[in-house]
Amino acid sequence: EKFPAVNQKPQAAXL
């Protein structure tokens, strides 16, 4: 969530 690029990935949301 902190990183914009990560927000693109559903798995990262999870983190």
Swiss-Prot record:
Domain of life: Eukaryota
Source organism per UniProt: Bothrops jararaca (Jararaca)
Molecular functions per Gene Ontology: toxin activity
Main localization (coarse): secreted
Disulphide connectivity of cysteines: none
Keywords: Blood coagulation cascade inhibiting toxin, Glycoprotein, Hemostasis impairing toxin, Secreted, Toxin
Tissue specificity of this protein: Plasma.
Localization terms from the record: Secreted
Protein name: Thrombin inhibitor subunit 1
Subunit structure, interactors included: Heteromer of subunit I and subunit II.
UniProt PTM: Glycosylated.
Function: Binds to thrombin and inhibits blood coagulant activity. Does not inhibit the serine protease activity of thrombin or platelet aggregation activity. May bind to the heparin recognition exosite.
GO cellular component: extracellular region
